[in-house]
Amino acid sequence: MISTVALFWALCVVCIVNMARYFSSLRALLVVLRGCDPLLYQYVDGGGFFTSHGQPNKQMRLVWYIYAQRYRDHHDDEFIRRCERVRGQFILTSALCGLVLISMVALLIWH
């Protein structure tokens, strides 16, 4: 029989791997954004996005831009495709993080 603790740690590893994929896709999206729409790149603080002095309110602009699917009217097909990929990975990663939290609470109650 599979240990519930081992199953929990496997779920944590899957969540961390998906977070890494999400951040990698977000970084690739910013590279495409710099080339196709410099004004939007500057609006979301693309140059300082992954730095310690990045501006969270500008980072949230990009998150809400993607979450609300406002990219669908953009002129660049590559940018649209990357945004759809990032949006899907964000939803998957959010669901996995929620599942990790729920399973952690269940594991604490159960053991």
Curated annotation (Swiss-Prot):
Cell compartments where the protein resides: Cell inner membrane
Main location: membrane
Superkingdom to which the source organism belongs: Bacteria
Pfam families: UspB
Keywords from the named record: Cell inner membrane, Cell membrane, Membrane, Transmembrane, Transmembrane helix
Signal peptide as annotated in the record: none
GO cellular component, one term: plasma membrane
InterPro entries according to UniProt: Universal_stress_protein_B
Sequence intervals crossing the membrane: 1-21, 90-110
Membrane topology: Multi-pass membrane protein
UniProt-listed NCBIfam families: PRK04960.1
Similarity-based family: Belongs to the universal stress protein B family.
Protein name (database record): Universal stress protein B
